[in-house]
Amino acid sequence: MCIAMAPRTLLLLIXCQLVFGFNEPLNIVSHLNDDWFLFGDSRSDCTYVENNGHPKLDWLDLDPKLCNSGKISAKSGNSLFRSFHFTDFYNYTGEGDQIVFYEGVNFSPSHGFKCLAHGDNKRWMGNKARFYARVYEKMAQYRSLSFVNVSYAYGGNAKPASICKDNTLTLNNPTFISKESNYVDYYYESEANFTLEGCDEFIVPLCGFNGHSKGSSSDAANKYYTDSQSYYNMDIGVLYGFNSTLDVGNTAKDPGLDLTCRYLALTPGNYKAVSLEYLLSLPSKAICLHKTKRFMPVQVVDSRWSSIRQSDNMTAAACQLPYCFFRNTSANYSGGTHDAHHGDFHFRQLLSGLLYNVSCIAQQGAFLYNNVSSSWPAYGYGHCPTAANIGYMAPVCIYDPLPVILLGVLLGIAVLIIVFLNVLFYDG
């Protein structure tokens, strides 16, 4: 307790008030040491080449000093979600203890992707949120992320079908198997085997058309079907699956049918994909998770366009405690030197924390020092400070004992110096 009644306690009160407001949490992404990694897009892609006369690297929100750090995996125009599902693929690969994500905007409502002409982009926004929630959760537990291909064995004659695409994107994960020619309709069970190996854990999509699917022109029966998809782990006997439940279709009068995906974290093993009705789907790509670590939340920077283009908040929805800390700015994204969507001053400030280490990373932000702060670090990791809160009506300081001990040592040294000087001058 600090009360203003004696010189020594007055000194303690002054020290407490000096502490008040000190070592505030910074709104940045940073790291505790050099064991970190960033996944990004054009705003952190140092390899992007353009010929429009702009200064070199002016599109970056990342500080160019980090371009040769070896701690960045980024691709202009891409994202983890986009590469996971579509033919527009970039082989994101990286490893670190403290993982940062600054990507996701390259699949947003402004693209308006739908599998079918009368589909629903909102369903894809839900897919995006579920995908990133799984990735963030798992990367708080694993050091390494990469992509791997998944091969399958199918006993029929039908070939993969490309039924989910628009003008710019073509889905290739999951793979859909066409109807067998010897069946008049899609009312039959089909299956294929696939194996997951070489990683500690895998993120794979389990997807189905949630609603009433109408057969293609090759379906002479011209019936509606209810999708049913599942994966069965043949090694341990566990079944993962779901059936379509929505009362929507794929016509102008009955719109809304689109692909709904769940993102499963599966262990290595032998699996069977089973469809009880309509198209069989199975994974063609997976995110490979490798090297478990002590739990360390990921840091996610809001990935959005400037206000002239529609964005979404799916990465924010996916970033939940305790496995994820979300960082954002209070202003609209406003590009500076390059265009409206690149080079925002505030986001550059937010990412500037990657230039240096901090002592503590917490929900509120990053703390530079590990002694005291006016804020208690919530969900703190690293060497975190203790809070010192002062009440103005009745000065009370709640403090970490260590700084007070150090203060006592310093006061003791000061007293010894004063005594020494007094003796010195007195003798003189």
From Swiss-Prot:
Q: What is its main location?
A: virion
Q: Where is this region: Esterase domain 1?
A: 9-129
- How the protein sits in the membrane? Single-pass type I membrane protein
Task: Report keywords, A-Z.
Answer: Disulfide bond, Glycoprotein, Hemagglutinin, Host cell membrane, Host membrane, Hydrolase, Membrane, Signal, Transmembrane, Transmembrane helix, Viral envelope protein, Virion
GO molecular function term, any single one: host cell surface receptor binding
Residue intervals passing through the bilayer: 405-425
- Which BP terms from GO are recorded? fusion of virus membrane with host plasma membrane
Catalytic machinery residues: S42, D339, H342
A single GO cellular-component term from the record reads:
membrane
Q: Where in the cell does this protein reside? A: Virion membrane; Host cell membrane
Reactions catalysed, as given in the entry: N-acetyl-9-O-acetylneuraminate + H2O = N-acetylneuraminate + acetate + H(+); N-acetyl-4-O-acetylneuraminate + H2O = N-acetylneuraminate + acetate + H(+)
**EC class of this enzyme?**
hydrolase
**Disulfide connectivity?**
C46-C67, C115-C164, C199-C288, C207-C261, C319-C324, C360-C384
Which loops or segments lie on the Intravirion side of the membrane, by the record?
426-428
In what way is this protein post-translationally modified? N-glycosylated in the RER.
Q: Which residues lie on this side of the membrane: Virion surface?
A: 20-404
* Region described as Receptor binding: spans on this chain: 130-278
* Glycan-bearing residues: N91, N149, N193, N243, N313, N328, N332, N357, N371
- Family as reported in the entry's similarity comment: Belongs to the influenza type C/coronaviruses hemagglutinin-esterase family.
Oligomeric and partner information? Homodimer; disulfide-linked. Forms a complex with the M protein in the pre-Golgi. Associates then with S-M complex to form a ternary complex S-M-HE.
Comment field (misc): Readthrough of the terminator UGA may occur between the codons for Ile-14 and Cys-16.
What is the protein's given name?
Answer: Hemagglutinin-esterase
